[in-house]
Structures are given as C-alpha cells and as structure tokens.
Swiss-Prot record:
InterPro entries: Asn/Gln-tRNA_amidoTrfase_suB/E (IPR017959), Asn/Gln-tRNA_Trfase_suB/E_cat (IPR006075), Asn/Gln_amidotransferase (IPR018027), Asn/Gln_tRNA_amidoTrase-B-like (IPR003789), GatB (IPR004413), GatB_C_1 (IPR042114), GatB_Yqey_C_2 (IPR023168), Gln-tRNA_amidoTrfase_suB_CS (IPR017958). SMART domains: GatB_Yqey. Pfam families: GatB_N, GatB_Yqey. HAMAP family: GatB (MF_00121). This is Aspartyl/glutamyl-tRNA(Asn/Gln) amidotransferase subunit B. One of its GO terms (molecular function) is asparaginyl-tRNA synthase (glutamine-hydrolyzing) activity. Heterotrimer of A, B and C subunits. Allows the formation of correctly charged Asn-tRNA(Asn) or Gln-tRNA(Gln) through the transamidation of misacylated Asp-tRNA(Asn) or Glu-tRNA(Gln) in organisms which lack either or both of asparaginyl-tRNA or glutaminyl-tRNA synthetases. The reaction takes place in the presence of glutamine and ATP through an activated phospho-Asp-tRNA(Asn) or phospho-Glu-tRNA(Gln). It catalyses: L-glutamyl-tRNA(Gln) + L-glutamine + ATP + H2O = L-glutaminyl-tRNA(Gln) + L-glutamate + ADP + phosphate + H(+); L-aspartyl-tRNA(Asn) + L-glutamine + ATP + H2O = L-asparaginyl-tRNA(Asn) + L-glutamate + ADP + phosphate + 2 H(+). Signal peptide: none annotated.
Amino acid sequence: MNFETVIGLEVHVELKTKSKIFSSSPTPFGAEANTQTSVIDLGYPGVLPVLNKEAVEFAMKAAMALNCEIATDTKFDRKNYFYPDNPKAYQISQFDKPIGENGWIEIEVGGKTKRIGITRLHLEEDAGKLTHTGDGYSLVDFNRQGTPLVEIVSEPDIRTPEEAYAYLEKLKSIIQYTGVSDCKMEEGSLRCDANISLRPIGQEEFGTKTELKNLNSFAFVQKGLEHEEKRQEQVLLSGFFIQQETRRYDEATKKTILMRVKEGSDDYRYFPEPDLVELYIDDEWKERVKASIPELPDERRKRYIEELGFAAYDAMVLTLTKEMADFFEETVQKGAEAKQASNWLMGEVSAYLNAEQKELADVALTPEGLAGMIKLIEKGTISSKIAKKVFKELIEKGGDAEKIVKEKGLVQISDEGVLLKLVTEALDNNPQSIEDFKNGKDRAIGFLVGQIMKASKGQANPPMVNKILLEEIKKR
C-alpha cells in the first residue's frame, strides 16, 4: 500500500516591539533573568493589561504580507492551562476571531511552484522560559513572559519534509522583510511545531497525526519529519494503528522520541478576556499599515530578473534574506557592477558565512569595502586571485580595499618589461614545455603560466602573461 504524507506547521514568531504586549516592560534579548518583568506580566491581583498598539500593527503587517484577510472585529481570549512558566495560569491569546485568516505563500521545490495555505495568524503573549538544571530542579525566567507573539498556522497542504523546509524558509524571509521580527531560532524568536499524518493515496480523510516539538532548526524540522514519515509508514504496513502522540526529534539518534500520548484534543476552556475590549480595525487603519509594508522578497526577485537580467536562481538566492539583498544593493550603489557583486556575495561571501556559521552583521565586510575591491578588479589593479587575499582581509578586519592593496604590495604586475623577464625565465627553465606545446600539448601553456604566477606570487596580469608567453614561444 502506498501512502500520502500530510503535514501542517504551527510557527510562533516573536514581534520586535519595544515593550511587551500588555505592559510597558522592555523586551531585550539576553538580559539578566527576571529583570524585564512587571506585576502585569506576572498577573498580580488587581492589575489590568493594556494592549500595545505597535504589536497589533506588527501583527497586521505580517498577516498582510502573508496575503491574509484582516479582521474588522477581533478580540482576545483566555487560554487556561497550568505550567511553571505560565504565572497567571492562563495565556491571553485569540481563539475564534484571529487578526488574520485565509492567507497563502508560494514555495518552489524541484523547479515547481506550489501555493501553501495559511489558516490563520493570531496575536498572543509568550510564556516564560524554563531551564532544567539536571539535579531535579527547574529554573524559570519571566523576562520573556508577555512578549508579543504571532502564531501562524498553515493549512495541511504540505506533502513532503522538503516542502516543509521550503515553507519555513519562505515564511521567515517574508517576515524578516516586513521588519516585525528578526526570526532568530537560536534566540527563540521563531519556533516551530509540526503535525504529520499518513493516509492511503486517494483517501480524503486524514490519518491520525503526531505532533513534533523541540525542533531547533529548519534542518531538524526536515529531518524529524523524514524520520516520522518512515516510522508511521512502518507502523501502518505492520498492521498497527498510529497513536495520537507528541514526540521530539533527537539529533543524536536521528529519531523521534515519544514525549506523551494524547488521548484527545487539549481543552483550554477558552473564554473572552474580560479585561480587554473587542478591537475594531477600520479600513483607514488597514490602509495605513499596508502602505508601510516594504518591497517583499518575491517583488524584489522579480525586479532583479527584469531590470538586472539575473537568472531566476541567482535572484532567489540574493533575495532570500533582506540582509543579503540590502547588502547587494548598497554594494551596487557604491559603484560595483551588479553581476560581479552578485557573484561575490553568492560565492566567496556566502561560503565564508556558512563555514564560520555567521551572518553578514557579524563580519567586518561592508558594501563600500566589497565595491572598492570589485572596482580594483575591473580596473586591472588586482587579479581575481589577489582579490581573494584582499577579500579575506576585508571580511575579517574590514577597511578600504585600495589601502589594503597598497599596504600589502598586492598591486597586479602589468608592466610589459617585468612580465617579459618573468616569461623569459620560465621558458629558459622549462625547455621541455616549449617542445610539448609545439607538439600539440596545450596543457604545457597552463604549466608555464603556473610557473610565472608562482614566481610573481600571484601578482602577474594573467591575460598579459598569456599574450607575451605565446609571442615568445613563437620566437623559439
């Protein structure tokens, strides 16, 4: 029997507001534990929440960027549950009137475009953070308690773990472009739970789902779903049934591990939040927020293809993060040729960032520095090989490309007299290579060029070396 995989994702995104959703407590990351909280966040008797307008507008902006319909009438509800990181014993969330519904984004997998529906986007407060010490104790930090969140729930339109990864990449990109969140999984500002089930191909009814939690990266989401897909298939083919469970992905064993069995859906006993009035969002407010949305990744990618003549793949890579796209545009504004700037960012820059596990903001390279180096290559002041030495200096220490070239004596040798001397020495020392070339072995030229570049410490002008070399061989 063949099965179809059905996946739905729930993504929590912390909003980058200056203060919390219902109090004036600040929201910096990494502050000393329990220093960024208040009696409102902790739910002391007699205190009342006040809704943060910026949080509402950030949620609206995110929902609009995800093609959601924005509610005119929306409200907040109490979600009741007990847990150590939830001091009020309830969370203020949205139940039946979310701020955004019926959205979608488009992903590309295997060269094919697919639309993934978004059921809803709702606004809520985050919980505190538990740290388990390993000696029987758990420590709780309430700094995060009350930080504004949006929960984005996808339709069960995702059919493969690869599609799930692509969906998360696209979702993160769009949210980052809006500026409402930095979406850093390592800091907890983007978190994801995945629901997965299998059903026989052709069957419309969904199978029993399992929920995957503690997914610390997009790669873990994909790996966890891949394992769970195989596990469920083996269970079903063995004649057993899938239990409704919550599981976690363990990277060490590369398996999903049972956390708890769920006998039914959770009953949070939602009821309208009595301390907050319903919220009315009129058309004027919607239009004002819509006008504040910047150019989104798909729009920027289309512009790069149409105006700069970039291949679709290059445009996609450059626009995946706003940080990279902005860096590219600033580099071009500083005088670099667009294609060269693109090549360096997709090549050497991305390779360095991946190897060091860093982002552009973490390195010393600036658009001015990269543009200056590219212009030196275009002018023939340095070769592409020398440029890699300059690039290493720029990305690790920063500075001005021209100044680095002069201080380190890296200017490309283009003086014909100097090059002729280098060519003559190479030919005198390698008579066999001359004979090999004359006998039709073109590789001999490559060897001779290599000897000349070695002698010049990589600074000889390659096109000029080739020209002089061929001329001198003819004379012998």
